[in-house]
């Protein structure tokens, strides 16, 4: 609390008038950081791209942004790796928003004849969960090289899967 008061140039008592506990402050910081992801993904949604290109851009933007946020904020980085359930609790609103964005991309792809999906919301849920599953290895640098250098293979896998043509 002392560090937060010092950094914000406020007294500890002043902080407690706005926040009940350190956890409340932590959640406020995480929510502010997650707004950056939302803003960058909003930018992707505004781009004039084909739905398949927009989907790939969306995934890469999500991963790059979360990596930047976690690496920039030491406390968040420690909690992200040690207590993901706390981070999950705070990011529920973002997850729901991302799923809506993904659904919009998928529906546009269906409309344009690019995608054949029976349930766009369920597909959005699956994509959202798959991307979240890649976050930790991506942040640690275990996937970043492959994802940067194998974008075409990743795109082919995303759109064509495992089956032979």
Q: Predicted regions span which residues?
A:
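Helix-turn-helix
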Residues: 1-24, 28
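Amphipathic alpha-helical interface segments
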Residues: 14, 61, 65, 130-137
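Amphipathic, non-transmembrane alpha-helical scaffold segments
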Residues: 26, 30, 34, 59, ...
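Hydrophobic alpha-helical connector segments
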Residues: 28, 32, 39-68, 123-127
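Secondary-structure edge/capping motif, primarily at the C-terminal ends of alpha-helices
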Residues: 44, 73-80, 138-142
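Short secondary-structure transition hinges
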Residues: 63-103, 111-112
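C-terminal peripheral helix-coil segments that are non-catalytic and often amphipathic
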Residues: 100-112, 129-130, 136, 140-165
């Amino acid at each position: 609390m002392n560090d937060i008061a010092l950094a914000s140039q406020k007294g500890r008592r002043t902080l407690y008038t706005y926040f009940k506990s350190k956890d409340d402050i932590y959640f406020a910081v995480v929510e502010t950081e997650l707004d950056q992801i939302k803003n960058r993904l909003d930018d992707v949604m505004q781009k004039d791209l084909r739905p398949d290109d927009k989907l790939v851009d969306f995934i890469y933007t999500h991963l790059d942004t979360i990596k930047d946020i976690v690496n920039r904020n030491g406390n968040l980085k420690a909690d992200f790796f040690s207590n993901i359930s706390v981070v999950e609790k705070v990011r529920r609103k973002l997850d729901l928003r991302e799923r809506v964005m993904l659904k919009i991309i998928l529906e546009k792809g269906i409309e344009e004849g690019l995608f054949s999906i029976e349930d766009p919301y369920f597909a959005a849920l699956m994509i959202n969960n798959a991307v979240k599953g890649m976050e930790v290895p991506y942040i640690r640098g275990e996937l970043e090289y492959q994802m940067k250098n194998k974008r075409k293979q990743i795109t082919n896998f995303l759109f064509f899967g495992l089956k032979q043509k």
